[in-house]
Protein backbone atom coordinates (compact mmCIF):
# COMPACT_ATOMS: atom_id res chain seq x y z
CA UNK A 1 0.00 0.00 0.00
CA UNK A 2 0.93 3.66 -0.26
CA UNK A 3 1.39 6.16 2.52
CA UNK A 4 0.15 9.72 2.29
CA UNK A 5 2.09 12.44 4.05
CA UNK A 6 0.89 15.75 5.41
CA UNK A 7 4.23 17.57 5.66
CA UNK A 8 4.83 20.94 7.29
CA UNK A 9 4.74 22.97 4.06
CA UNK A 10 1.61 25.03 3.42
CA UNK A 11 1.08 23.17 0.15
CA UNK A 12 1.05 19.79 1.90
CA UNK A 13 -1.00 21.01 4.86
CA UNK A 14 -3.62 22.28 2.43
CA UNK A 15 -4.24 18.66 1.39
CA UNK A 16 -6.44 18.33 4.46
CA UNK A 17 -8.82 20.89 2.94
CA UNK A 18 -9.38 19.03 -0.34
CA UNK A 19 -12.79 19.41 -1.88
CA UNK A 20 -14.95 16.47 -2.91
CA UNK A 21 -13.78 16.55 -6.54
CA UNK A 22 -10.11 16.40 -5.49
CA UNK A 23 -10.80 13.51 -3.13
CA UNK A 24 -12.69 11.71 -5.89
CA UNK A 25 -9.73 12.18 -8.25
CA UNK A 26 -7.40 10.61 -5.69
CA UNK A 27 -9.77 7.70 -5.10
CA UNK A 28 -10.04 7.07 -8.85
CA UNK A 29 -6.23 7.01 -9.13
CA UNK A 30 -6.02 4.65 -6.15
CA UNK A 31 -8.62 2.37 -7.75
CA UNK A 32 -6.88 2.40 -11.16
CA UNK A 33 -3.50 1.67 -9.61
CA UNK A 34 -4.93 -1.01 -7.36
CA UNK A 35 -2.78 0.40 -4.58
CA UNK A 36 -4.69 1.73 -1.55
CA UNK A 37 -3.50 4.45 0.78
CA UNK A 38 -3.05 2.44 3.96
CA UNK A 39 -1.57 5.07 6.23
CA UNK A 40 -1.10 8.80 6.58
CA UNK A 41 1.84 10.47 8.28
CA UNK A 42 1.02 13.87 9.76
CA UNK A 43 4.54 15.25 10.04
CA UNK A 44 3.12 18.79 9.94
CA UNK A 45 2.75 18.26 13.69
CA UNK A 46 6.47 18.89 14.01
CA UNK A 47 6.04 22.51 12.90
CA UNK A 48 2.68 22.84 14.65
CA UNK A 49 3.37 20.83 17.80
CA UNK A 50 0.62 19.44 20.00
CA UNK A 51 2.54 20.52 23.10
CA UNK A 52 3.73 23.94 21.97
CA UNK A 53 3.52 26.61 24.71
CA UNK A 54 1.88 28.96 22.17
CA UNK A 55 -1.88 28.40 22.27
CA UNK A 56 -2.33 29.48 18.62
CA UNK A 57 0.17 26.87 17.46
CA UNK A 58 -1.60 24.19 19.52
CA UNK A 59 -4.95 25.22 17.99
CA UNK A 60 -3.44 24.92 14.50
CA UNK A 61 -1.99 21.52 15.46
CA UNK A 62 -5.40 20.29 16.57
CA UNK A 63 -7.02 21.58 13.39
CA UNK A 64 -4.41 19.72 11.33
CA UNK A 65 -4.89 16.54 13.37
CA UNK A 66 -8.69 16.61 13.16
CA UNK A 67 -8.83 17.45 9.46
CA UNK A 68 -6.21 14.76 8.74
CA UNK A 69 -8.36 12.16 10.48
CA UNK A 70 -11.44 13.33 8.57
CA UNK A 71 -9.49 13.15 5.29
CA UNK A 72 -8.34 9.64 6.20
CA UNK A 73 -11.98 8.60 6.56
CA UNK A 74 -12.85 10.06 3.15
CA UNK A 75 -9.90 8.36 1.43
CA UNK A 76 -10.25 4.99 3.15
CA UNK A 77 -7.00 5.37 5.08
CA UNK A 78 -6.97 3.14 8.16
CA UNK A 79 -4.08 4.51 10.22
CA UNK A 80 -2.99 8.08 10.88
CA UNK A 81 0.48 8.49 12.34
CA UNK A 82 1.38 11.40 14.56
CA UNK A 83 4.97 12.18 15.52
CA UNK A 84 6.09 11.41 19.05
CA UNK A 85 7.12 14.98 19.84
CA UNK A 86 5.59 17.19 22.48
CA UNK A 87 7.51 19.99 20.80
CA UNK A 88 10.02 19.84 17.97
CA UNK A 89 11.28 23.41 17.69
CA UNK A 90 11.84 24.25 21.32
CA UNK A 91 12.58 22.76 24.70
CA UNK A 92 10.52 19.91 26.09
CA UNK A 93 9.18 20.91 29.50
CA UNK A 94 6.58 19.76 32.00
CA UNK A 95 4.21 22.27 30.38
CA UNK A 96 4.78 20.98 26.81
CA UNK A 97 4.28 17.40 27.98
CA UNK A 98 1.02 18.38 29.71
CA UNK A 99 -0.32 20.13 26.58
CA UNK A 100 0.76 17.18 24.44
CA UNK A 101 -1.13 14.70 26.62
CA UNK A 102 -4.26 16.90 26.70
CA UNK A 103 -4.28 17.17 22.91
CA UNK A 104 -3.54 13.50 22.31
CA UNK A 105 -6.57 12.66 24.46
CA UNK A 106 -8.67 14.91 22.22
CA UNK A 107 -7.20 13.26 19.12
CA UNK A 108 -8.08 9.82 20.49
CA UNK A 109 -11.68 10.98 20.95
CA UNK A 110 -11.78 12.25 17.36
CA UNK A 111 -10.25 8.99 16.12
CA UNK A 112 -12.85 6.98 18.01
CA UNK A 113 -15.67 9.12 16.61
CA UNK A 114 -14.35 8.63 13.07
CA UNK A 115 -13.27 4.98 13.44
CA UNK A 116 -9.62 5.62 12.56
CA UNK A 117 -6.57 4.25 14.35
CA UNK A 118 -3.96 6.81 15.38
CA UNK A 119 -0.42 5.65 15.98
CA UNK A 120 2.48 7.38 17.66
CA UNK A 121 5.50 7.32 15.39
CA UNK A 122 8.54 6.76 17.57
CA UNK A 123 11.07 9.51 16.89
CA UNK A 124 14.78 10.19 17.26
CA UNK A 125 14.35 12.56 20.21
CA UNK A 126 14.42 11.69 23.90
CA UNK A 127 10.72 12.40 24.36
CA UNK A 128 9.45 9.33 22.49
CA UNK A 129 12.40 7.47 21.01
CA UNK A 130 11.36 4.01 22.22
CA UNK A 131 8.19 1.97 22.11
CA UNK A 132 8.34 1.86 25.91
CA UNK A 133 8.01 5.64 26.11
CA UNK A 134 5.18 5.55 23.57
CA UNK A 135 3.39 2.86 25.59
CA UNK A 136 3.38 5.18 28.61
CA UNK A 137 1.34 7.73 26.65
CA UNK A 138 -0.89 5.06 25.13
CA UNK A 139 -1.64 3.85 28.66
CA UNK A 140 -2.31 7.38 29.96
CA UNK A 141 -4.77 8.06 27.14
CA UNK A 142 -6.38 4.62 27.47
CA UNK A 143 -8.11 4.49 24.08
CA UNK A 144 -8.56 1.54 21.76
CA UNK A 145 -7.94 4.01 18.92
CA UNK A 146 -4.43 5.09 19.98
CA UNK A 147 -1.57 2.71 19.24
CA UNK A 148 2.14 2.79 18.38
CA UNK A 149 3.63 2.89 14.90
CA UNK A 150 7.33 2.17 15.54
CA UNK A 151 9.74 3.64 13.02
CA UNK A 152 12.96 1.65 13.07
CA UNK A 153 14.60 4.28 10.86
CA UNK A 154 14.38 6.80 13.66
CA UNK A 155 16.31 4.42 15.91
CA UNK A 156 18.93 3.60 13.28
CA UNK A 157 19.60 7.16 12.07
CA UNK A 158 21.38 8.36 15.25
CA UNK A 159 23.53 5.23 15.20
CA UNK A 160 24.44 5.78 11.56
CA UNK A 161 25.32 9.41 12.27
CA UNK A 162 27.68 8.30 15.03
CA UNK A 163 29.27 5.79 12.70
CA UNK A 164 29.65 8.31 9.87
CA UNK A 165 31.17 10.97 12.13
CA UNK A 166 33.77 8.64 13.62
Briefly describe each language-model feature range.
Residues 3-31, 84-91:
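Glycine-rich, proline-tolerant flexible connector loops at the mouths of alpha/beta enzymes
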Residues 6, 10, 124, 154:
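Short, glycine/acidic-enriched loop or turn micro-motifs at the edges of active sites
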Residues 19-20, 136-137, 165-166:
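Glycine-rich, phosphate-binding/catalytic loops in enzymes
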Residues 29, 34, 38-40:
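Conserved alpha-helical segments that form or flank metal/cofactor-binding pockets of metalloenzymes
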Residues 158-166:
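Glycoside hydrolase catalytic-domain groove-lining segments
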Amino acid sequence: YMEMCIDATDEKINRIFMNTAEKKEIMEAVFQAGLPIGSMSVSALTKYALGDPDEEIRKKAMQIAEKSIELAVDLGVRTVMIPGYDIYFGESTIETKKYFLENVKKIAEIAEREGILVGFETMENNFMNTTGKAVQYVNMVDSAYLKIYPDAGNRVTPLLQLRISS
